[in-house]
A protein has these predicted regions:
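Fold-independent oxyanion-binding glycine-rich loops
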Residues: 1, 18-20, 27, 34-36, ...
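Conserved PLP phosphate-binding loop immediately N-terminal to the Schiff-base lysine helix
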Residues: 1-14, 18
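Short coil/turn connectors at secondary-structure junctions
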Residues: 10-12, 26-29, 149, 161
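Structural motif
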Residues: 13-14, 30-31, 105, 151-152
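Active-site C-terminal subdomain of aminotransferase-like
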Residues: 22-106, 110
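Conserved PLP-binding catalytic core of the aspartate aminotransferase-like
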Residues: 114-148
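Conserved PLP-binding active-site segment of the aspartate aminotransferase-like
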Residues: 129-134, 152-170
Length: 170
């Protein structure tokens, strides 16, 4: 529900997402799309599996059995969010996300800050990474924004922790 993504058309082998990714839901459901090629490769893989095997899950789906209690509240929420997305229209949603993303990037540029993106024009329509000037702790900026404006910004991940923050604009 966030970006135009075409698993089959683009020849992607495995796509994994979650209910919190553009579907207006809290975390709790995982969505998996697996190509025939990936399923076949999985059948011949020699690496042991501690948790997940595609073929076992596909067999369980055929019978309606699932190895755990599903989060029915999220499934009802998913049904509603999908109705809302289809009512607005996916092309309209994608265009809205692009507009909001560009507005966010324009604000960041107006603040005189650097946008964390390797290639200009390849920005994400769902979040903007904002680099802090040298000597400014991004996590302290996040804390100030949260305390003063009740806005939660994402932290920098890995080597970028403390150097940047992330603004989600879905």
């Amino acid at each position: 529900g966030s970006v135009d993504y075409r698993h089959d058309e683009w020849g992607v082998d495995v796509t994994i997402s979650g209910s919190q990714k553009g579907l207006m839901l809290p975390p709790g459901i995982s969505f998996n799309a697996v190509s025939t090629k990936a399923l076949e490769a999985s059948k011949h893989a020699s690496m042991g599996r501690a948790f997940w095997a595609w073929d076992e899950i596909i067999e369980m789906n055929k019978t309606g059995y699932w190895p755990y209690t599903p989060n029915t509240n999220l499934l009802y929420g998913l049904s509603e969010s999908l109705d809302m997305l289809l009512e607005e229209g996916l092309d309209n949603i994608f265009a809205r996300h692009e507009r909001l993303a560009e507005a966010c990037r324009a604000a960041v540029r107006a603040w005189g800050l650097e946008i964390q993106c390797v290639e200009d024009g390849r920005h994400s329509p769902v979040l903007t990474g904002v680099m802090m000037p040298e000597g400014v702790d991004a996590d302290q900026v996040r804390k100030l924004i949260y305390e003063n404006f009740n806005m939660s910004l994402g932290t920098g991940l890995g080597k970028l922790k403390g150097l940047m923050f992330r603004i989600g604009h879905l």
